[in-house]
Amino acid sequence: MNNIWWQTKGQGNVHLVLLHGWGLNAEVWRCIDEELSSHFTLHLVDLPGFGRSRGFGAMSLADMAEAVLRQAPDKAIWLGWSLGGLVASQIALTHPERVQALVTVASSPCFSARDEWPGIKPDVLAGFQQQLSDDFQRTVERFLALQTMGTETARQDARALKKTVLALPMPEVDVLNGGLEILKTVDLRQPLQNVFMPFLRLYGYLDGLVPRKVVPMLDKLWPHSESYIFAKAAHAPFISHPAEFCRMLVALKQRV
């Protein structure tokens, strides 16, 4: 069995598992891991096929969630950013007894635009899939640039993301393609109506991948959840607003 790369830091009485987004790895959390590990027992994870979790091919969302769960603490707050938000949500749906609280960051239950649902146009995601086979390093860099556009610190935030990608070997093309397929096809809007643990959704006002229009729609669909929009953030609020981001998680800890 292939192993997921997993690092544990801190001795807090609440476990917090962080799941990164598409094309990246757990190094993306280095800007906040010291602060968070002073409040939580923090778990940094490379999703299957990404970063140091080698030897995995393309996986379905359900298989990815099960692979991550095998090495997880019995109970934790699960936080997922972007694609990682879908993985954390899937775990909350299938193993609610393992999830003290669910936090999604710049994530959508349905990334792909549908009828009367704002999101990434399916042909844009299909275009990324096509370009992966031509020049996958450049494609990943383009995707990262999209994530920070519009913020006051866009250039340095994009550099931080690129540094994260380059710190470790690139994922295999089929893994990247499989991740895009999840973003293109998965729709958890209805299933997540049945999640009743504390559920915090964090967004960036300037996010070009998860439009802020989805926030009031999901407030209505999931009245038991809470949402918060970082006014000057894009797709990576923990990089552009680390102190504010950590404060929200510490406040959540008091409630679980």
Curated annotation (Swiss-Prot):
Pathway listed: Cofactor biosynthesis; biotin biosynthesis
Pfam families for this protein: Abhydrolase_1
Residues annotated as catalytic: 82 (nucleophile), 207, 235
EC number(s) on file: 3.1.1.85
Leader sequence segment: none
UniProt keyword annotations, A-Z: Biotin biosynthesis, Cytoplasm, Hydrolase, Serine esterase
Listed GO CC annotations: cytoplasm
GO MF term list: pimelyl-[acyl-carrier protein] methyl ester esterase activity
Catalytic activities: 6-carboxyhexanoyl-[ACP] methyl ester + H2O = 6-carboxyhexanoyl-[ACP] + methanol + H(+)
Domain annotation AB hydrolase-1: ranges: 15-242
Location relative to the cell: Cytoplasm
InterPro entries: AB_hydrolase_1, AB_hydrolase_fold, BioH, Carboxylesterase_BioH
One GO term of the biological process aspect: biotin biosynthetic process
Keyword Hydrolase attributed: yes
Annotated coiled-coil segments of the chain: none
Residues the record lists as binding substrate: 22, 82-83, 143-147, 235
Function (record text): The physiological role of BioH is to remove the methyl group introduced by BioC when the pimeloyl moiety is complete. It allows to synthesize pimeloyl-ACP via the fatty acid synthetic pathway through the hydrolysis of the ester bonds of pimeloyl-ACP esters.
PANTHER family: HYDROLASE ALPHA/BETA FOLD FAMILY (PTHR43194), PIMELOYL-[ACYL-CARRIER PROTEIN] METHYL ESTER ESTERASE (PTHR43194:SF5)
UniProt xrefs under NCBIfam families: bioH, PRK10349.1
Quaternary structure, from the entry: Monomer.
Sequence similarity: Belongs to the AB hydrolase superfamily. Carboxylesterase BioH family.
Name under which the protein is recorded: Pimeloyl-[acyl-carrier protein] methyl ester esterase
